[in-house]
């Protein structure tokens, strides 16, 4: 039985020539007399630092105390690039990063409620509010407490409920020190304190 013919390995010389061809500039002839086709690499441009407005610089330096600021007067400060928030509400001056958030906010001032519940006709400013509302009609309660199993139609109601298990009472009365799990309970409690006359 004959052994199959094996290929001879190419010598290193042609590879070196190929490498030499790549290094030549377009239009110049290679060692074989052919024109080079690869363009030389352009040097990378230095990265531009963001240009800060005088207001931005003042805002940055306000964070330092006056003596520290004097030490660095005229020294450029690098601040990571932050996208401006170009959408400002004409009514209240509130600024938004995204156009869609600005449009949604405008409905607060116009009173527009373009989203309607199919079952009862109630209208809402946001589509997500309709989705939450429709759970009243369907009886869906997708938010379940891991401790006791009680279910809720709204995630915020589950968070409020979980405070009954943790004992968390973050809302404290400044007058008597009594604490409450819910802000509404604190507001109700404050009404029981006699008002101070100034």
UniProtKB/Swiss-Prot annotation:
Residues 1-12, 32-47 have a biased composition (Basic residues). Its main location: nucleus. GO terms for molecular function: sequence-specific double-stranded DNA binding; zinc ion binding. InterPro entries: Znf_C2H2_sf, Znf_C2H2_type. A zinc finger (C2H2-type) spans 87-109, 115-137, 143-165, 171-193. It is found in: Nucleus. One of its GO terms (biological process) is spermatogenesis. It holds the Pfam family zf-C2H2. A putative DNA-binding regulatory protein associated with meiosis in spermatogenesis. Belongs to the krueppel C2H2-type zinc-finger protein family. This is Zinc finger protein 41. It comes from Mus musculus (Mouse).
């Amino acid at each position: 039985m004959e052994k199959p013919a094996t290929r001879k390995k190419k010598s290193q010389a042609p590879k070196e020539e190929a490498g030499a061809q790549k290094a030549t500039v377009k239009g110049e002839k290679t060692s074989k007399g052919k024109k080079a086709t690869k363009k030389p690499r352009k040097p990378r441009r230095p990265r531009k630092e963001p240009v800060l407005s005088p207001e931005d610089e003042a805002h940055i330096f306000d964070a330092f105390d006056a003596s520290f600021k004097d030490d660095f007067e005229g020294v450029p400060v690098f601040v990571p690039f932050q996208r401006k928030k170009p959408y400002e509400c004409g009514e209240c001056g509130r600024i938004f990063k995204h156009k869609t958030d600005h449009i949604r906010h405008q409905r607060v001032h116009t009173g527009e409620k373009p989203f309607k519940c199919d079952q009862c006709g109630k209208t809402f400013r946001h589509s997500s509010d309709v989705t939450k509302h429709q759970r009243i009609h369907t009886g869906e309660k997708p938010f379940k407490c891991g401790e006791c199993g009680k279910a809720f139609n709204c995630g915020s109601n589950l968070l409020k409920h979980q405070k009954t298990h943790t004992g968390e009472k973050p809302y404290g009365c400044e007058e008597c020190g009594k604490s409450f799990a819910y802000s509404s309970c604190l507001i109700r409690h404050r009404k029981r304190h006699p008002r101070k006359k100034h």
